[in-house]
Amino acid sequence: SSAASDVYKRQGEEPSPAPRTYVLSSPKVRLVQTEEVRAQLGSAQQTLIDARAEPRFKGEVEPLDPIAGHIPGALNRPFAHNIAADGCFKSAEVLKQEFSALLAGRDPASVVHHCGSGVSAVPNLLAMEIAGLGSTGLYAGSWSEWSNTPGLPCARG
């Protein structure tokens, strides 16, 4: 029994769960697989944004994966750059300015976010939504999957 149900019992208000039906909507995020990323390398149809810290992106250090570096052509936007001094996301206006500068005229809809394992990319994805730049993609396999797939190109610097 949970602490919450114990409180209800003491108050004489035993909760009675009722069956519910939930209808799931289609995913709000476009999930991209390794083969799609590879097929679109260098294409204007895809703008990769890597959310890892700059030393990992540049290949100066790699504590987790067998190869250091990044997917060729990727831009670097460490996820922590989205957070203001108060610990919350920066304002929509600031995020829009920063991402627009990073994209340098590229279509925001072409963006596919990634990181080391797909987790740290999400703050960048959310930041672009907050900025009003629209829905973007997520390559959840990220650097871990890319660097562990034989034959895929890797870049450093």
Give short role names for the model-derived ranges.
Residues 1-8:
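Short, small-residue-biased leader/transition segments that mark boundaries at the very start
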Residues 9-27:
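A short "linker-to-beta-strand initiation" element
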Residues 33-109, 148, 155-157:
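Positively charged, proline/Ser/Thr-rich regional signature most characteristic
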Residues 50, 114, 139:
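Active-site-adjacent beta-strand anchor residues
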Residues 85, 120-124, 145-148:
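Short active-site-adjacent structural elements
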Residues 96-106, 119-131:
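Catalytic-pocket segment enriched in acidic/His residues
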Residues 111-113, 119, 125, 131, ...:
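C-terminal soluble interaction/assembly domains
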Residues 134-157:
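Cysteine-dependent PTP/DSP-like catalytic domain, specifically the C-terminal lobe
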